Amino acid sequence: MESEAGTNRTAVAEFMLLGLVQTEEMQSVIFVLLLFAYLVTTGGNLSILAAILVEPKLHTPMYFFLGNLSVLDVGCITVTVPAMLGRLLSHKSTISYDACLSQLFFFHLLAGMDCFLLTAMAYDRFLAICRPLTYSTHMNQRVQRMLVAVSWTCAFTNALTHTIALTTLNFCGPSVINHFYCDLPQLFQLSCSSTQLNELLLFVAAAVMAVAPLVFISVSYAHVVAAVLQIHSAEGRKKAFSTCGSHLTVVGIFYGTGVFSYMRLGSVESSDKDKGVGVFMTVINPMLNPLIYSLRNTDVQGALCQLLVVKRSLT
């Protein structure tokens, strides 16, 4: 630990991440499982992205947002899993203070972007189903890019605010984090100075980035369901519900795990439940998303099959 200039307090130079398991035998199992999950997630999401790029039929607003979501999923798992794999290989559980802050920043940047992107996707479905005559006008390429740019700006501002606010806290020790990556609730527990401002910022962020988007998504889909029920064609209703069902499943999993993680700031210490939710947020969610969207979408399935045929013909 290093002494802070001008004070009698000490600053933690690095943290110790306890990880998912402590026994060496189980660490080998965890390494294999995480490596498998990482390869499946990156492969699945990049395949969907490639299919969207090469298939002209998928050059629509819905798939533009889905392609961006695939990039986010790859980024989300890359922020946490490779670093953990490195620690398991080297048998080192420490992470430097700066690396911890960097991980936290990028995690919240990508998670924040996820919030806004899922909201944009709900707005896209609302316009496509409830306002079909003006859809191409209200959701043109300029609007799509603007929505993504605004989402990145808001997510960046949120992540930077939390990271800067965290640098004002004093960490005097102990420096043991009962988790496998750096996040706000666990770091708040280690602070020897008041975290009241930080928790207030997190509360405001939750209102702006979770509650407001969730309300917007709920209202949008209430209108969508009402409009779909008025469709006379059974095939049309099935296709609309299939597309919307995939998105709602992803929204439910994402917000469900997020609420559990950040609405428990009053708890005294981290538990294995927090680690389980962390695995769901950073590993399971990104791995499931391609499966959810491709299983219920014949267009994506067709594009992926074409991609495989092209790949085989090239080899």
Swiss-Prot record:
It is a multi-pass membrane protein. The chain crosses the membrane at residues 29-52, 61-82, 104-123, 144-161, 200-222, 240-262, 276-295. Coiled coil: none annotated. The keyword GTP-binding does not apply. The keyword Coiled coil does not apply. InterPro entries: GPCR_Rhodpsn, GPCR_Rhodpsn_7TM, Olfact_rcpt. GO terms for molecular function: G protein-coupled receptor activity; olfactory receptor activity. GO terms for biological process: signal transduction. Disulfide bonds join 100-192. Keywords: Cell membrane, Disulfide bond, G-protein coupled receptor, Glycoprotein, Membrane, Olfaction, Receptor, Sensory transduction, Transducer, Transmembrane, Transmembrane helix. Residues 1-28, 83-103, 162-199, 263-275 are extracellular. It is found in: Cell membrane. Glycans are attached at residue 8. Pfam families: 7tm_4 (PF13853). Residues 53-60, 124-143, 223-239, 296-315 are cytoplasmic. PROSITE patterns: G_PROTEIN_RECEP_F1_1, G_PROTEIN_RECEP_F1_2. GO terms for cellular component: plasma membrane. Belongs to the G-protein coupled receptor 1 family. Odorant receptor. This is Olfactory receptor 3A3. It comes from Pan troglodytes (Chimpanzee).
